[in-house]
């Protein structure tokens, strides 16, 4: 009974670690509407939101994976 619960917890943490970076990525790429009194420039914005935050989300994914694997190794 205890091993099954720990295995489910580990798989849940792994699933959360895989889905969390996609949620962060989707929130960063949302586009806000422009106010009517501003000019829209044709040049692209150099600080693109898709290039930020990739390392930290990968690092948190690796950390959660290591935590879940260590819990599985400890209890199973």
Swiss-Prot record:
Residue ranges of the region described as Disordered: 37-57
Keyword terms, alphabetized: Cell membrane, Glycoprotein, GPI-anchor, Immunity, Innate immunity, Lipoprotein, Membrane, Signal
Gene Ontology MF terms: carbohydrate binding; Hsp70 protein binding; Hsp90 protein binding; protein kinase binding; protein tyrosine kinase activator activity
Segments of skewed composition (Polar residues): 37-51
Site (Not glycosylated): 45
Pfam family, one: CD24
Entry membrane topology: Lipid-anchor; GPI-anchor
Residues bearing a lipid moiety (GPI-anchor amidated glycine): 53
Broad class of the protein's primary localization: membrane
Biological processes annotated in GO: apoptotic mitochondrial changes; apoptotic nuclear changes; apoptotic signaling pathway; B cell apoptotic process; B cell proliferation; B cell receptor transport into membrane raft; calcium-mediated signaling; CD4-positive, alpha-beta T cell proliferation
Maturation propeptide residues: 54-76
Coiled coil: none
UniProt tissue specificity: In lymphoid, myeloid, and erythroid cells.
Localization in the cell: Cell membrane
Positions annotated as glycosylated: 27, 30, 39, 41, 43, 48, 51
Its job: May have a pivotal role in cell differentiation of different cell types. May have a specific role in early thymocyte development. Signaling could be triggered by the binding of a lectin-like ligand to the CD24 carbohydrates, and transduced by the release of second messengers derived from the GPI-anchor. Modulates B-cell activation responses. In association with SIGLEC10 may be involved in the selective suppression of the immune response to danger-associated molecular patterns (DAMPs) such as HMGB1, HSP70 and HSP90. Plays a role in the control of autoimmunity.
Protein name: Signal transducer CD24
Lineage: Eukaryota, Metazoa, Chordata, Craniata, Vertebrata
């Amino acid at each position: 009974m205890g091993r099954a619960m720990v295995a489910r917890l580990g798989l849940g943490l792994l699933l959360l670690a895989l889905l969390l970076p996609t949620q962060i990525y989707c929130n960063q790429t949302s586009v806000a509407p422009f106010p009517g009194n501003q000019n829209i420039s044709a040049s692209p914005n150099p600080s693109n939101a898709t290039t930020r935050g990739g390392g930290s989300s990968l690092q948190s994914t690796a950390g959660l994976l290591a935590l879940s694997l260590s819990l599985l190794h400890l209890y199973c």
